[in-house]
Amino acid sequence: MTNFREILKEKRAWYKTIGKVYCPILKEYIIFNSRGFYHLRYDTHEKERLVKEQIYKFNLLPLVIPVIKNATKIFDYKKQEYSKPLGKYYEIWELREIMGEKSPTEVSVILRKIGTGNITFLSVYDRKIKTKKPPKSR
């Protein structure tokens, strides 16, 4: 298995190439800055995430762009709230899309706008979709 430092270096290099992606549902460009990548590695309280969790989030990164480009609705929106640590108001959007055919996964992309700045990528996670199995015949 490739060691974590190599994975981190590879994913960071790929992330830096993104720059910005247009989001039709928000009618704005989403900026991929260093804060978004930092949040994949550290939680809200600045504590480093477990390596397993970081790799999990890194592996979801390629799905972020299709979710942003193809989202047909905003799943959740948190209106402007004041953040003492940021010293500014912020807004949060959650976009969700189902990705994959064989084993569909619902991918959530979290976007944030601080003050009057740009909307930026903040995080990503997924949820396996449970498919109903036919009842067993007796």
Describe the predicted segments one by one:
Residues M1-R138:
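Ribonuclease/tRNase effector modules and their secretory precursors
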